[in-house]
């Protein structure tokens, strides 16, 4: 398959699935060659899907029922609060959330970093995650604990210091096999391919793949692109006005501790730019999970959860597991 990639020929879903498993037993040099050849050629939906399905199949198994995930690829280089973590806690007030996350690679506040800064403990085992889900409607699945098969591949990826397919696989490889997912990507071109890949991996009833003017989130200060999947595909653009919100600035964030403090400020009812950023993305997640009928409804549901104290109470439940 390496020669095929060098000739810039695309792999099928089945070939991509096979290649992932081949890489688990290859030398570091050949792993690097495959990853660079694949990236140089350009990734297709079938290749992303084949790798993602193989990554899920090699993951530590966990069954949490019908869950939603809120996760982004990262890699946008932005210094923002961790919106997906805030959204996941709001969402857990209404439905089961399996948040697949990791430590930061390119940002100042990866989801695992912020989760810990919020005073929450990362479940050590699948049984611990199930206990958390049963008690709180929420489980944090720390990626490093669920993908031991990548132990040989990740040092090569890190040493290469260039983008590879693994930069976008994390959100597609949630071992809980989410039924609903809002997934942020770091380039507009990825929206359609990642949505198609999600549909091919299987198990998804509804998903939104979003890109927000340089962010792997919906942006509160401009136009965002969404590719929606619910058995069919639909691509469209939105602005804060579609959510009944004003445009607002994105305030830089310098650390996980700062991100956690600012999330708690919003959960406590503080009205500021962060609130709009979080409400917009929470509304999209509530719509994705079929809790809200549309984005406007999602904003109202999220506002009520914050203003009534439900979200702060949910955070306290998660802290106390």
Swiss-Prot record:
In terms of domain of life, where is this protein from? Archaea
Which pathway does this chain act in? Amino-acid biosynthesis; L-tryptophan biosynthesis; L-tryptophan from chorismate: step 2/5
Q: Cofactor note from UniProt? A: Binds 2 magnesium ions per monomer.
Coiled-coil residue spans: none
Q: Which reaction does it catalyse?
A: N-(5-phospho-beta-D-ribosyl)anthranilate + diphosphate = 5-phospho-alpha-D-ribose 1-diphosphate + anthranilate
Q: Which cofactor does it need?
A: Mg(2+)
Q: Where does anthranilate 2 bind?
A: 157
Q: What class of enzyme is it?
A: transferase
What Enzyme Commission number(s) does the record list for this chain? 2.4.2.18
Q: Which residues bind anthranilate 1?
A: 72, 102
Q: Which GO terms describe its molecular function?
A: anthranilate phosphoribosyltransferase activity; magnesium ion binding
Which residues are listed for Mg(2+) 2 binding in this entry? 216-217
Q: Which biological process terms from the Gene Ontology are attached to this UniProt entry?
A: L-tryptophan biosynthetic process
Q: Which residues form the signal peptide?
A: none
> Which UniProt keywords are given for this protein, alphabetically ordered?
Amino-acid biosynthesis, Aromatic amino acid biosynthesis, Glycosyltransferase, Magnesium, Metal-binding, Transferase, Tryptophan biosynthesis
**Per its database record, what is this protein's job?**
Catalyzes the transfer of the phosphoribosyl group of 5-phosphorylribose-1-pyrophosphate (PRPP) to anthranilate to yield N-(5'-phosphoribosyl)-anthranilate (PRA).
The entry's family comment says: Belongs to the anthranilate phosphoribosyltransferase family.
Cited NCBIfam families:
trpD (TIGR01245)
Q: What is this protein called?
A: Anthranilate phosphoribosyltransferase
Q: Which organism is it from?
A: Methanococcus maripaludis (strain DSM 14266 / JCM 13030 / NBRC 101832 / S2 / LL)
